[in-house]
Amino acid sequence: MRQTLACLSAPALLVAATALSGCMQTGDGFDEPPAMRWDHRPEAAEWTQAAISALASDGAVLATTVPADIETFCPNYAEASLEERQAFWSGLFSALAQFESTWNPKASGGGGAWIGLLQIAPSTARAYSCDATSTSGLKDGAANLSCAVKIAARQVPRDNAIVDNGAPGWEGLARDWAPMRSSTKVKAMAAWTSKQSYCVKPGSRA
């Protein structure tokens, strides 16, 4: 599967990713919608759809990237389908949102410097050409997630890492999100994502 994904041209990848994300939203690829850490929230379906849609467009590169430290977060990722990889990235953002905002889309941290589900600064949103660049815009959960995917799509391939490729300094998502610099929080996030159906190796599934 890795070779197939790697050989797709950018337009073909976008078409494939969009088609597969549509299957996920209707449940065609899973017996039930893929699990997210925010599933207890009333906005859960909207947020998951927003994340998957962003991963099929601006963030399509994430599902074709195999980070050096992916085994920690998603043991089956290297062999996973494009759809399962998208589910993983969405799941990881849902886990990160717990530590950034406790899933509160209106959260404001750092004296108003960081906004929303993933605590994104308006200046950062502008730097990454996100659709939402204002405080009010970033308090929309779906828009905040779409922006987060754009940021990740730049940083993860740049370092070939979610948080660690063996080089010194902050890498991947740790460049922009403080919880990814905490070994305790990273361990908690990885413990959750790695046991989800889209990350468990087939032979290990119950």
Language-model regions, residue ranges each:
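Non-catalytic cell-wall polysaccharide-engagement segments
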Residues: R2-T4, C23-A68, C130-A206
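Bacterial Sec-type N-terminal signal peptides, specifically the leucine/valine-rich hydrophobic h-region
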Residues: A17-L20
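Acidic helix-start/capping segments at beta-turn-to-alpha-helix junctions
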Residues: T65-L82, G112-L117, P168-W177
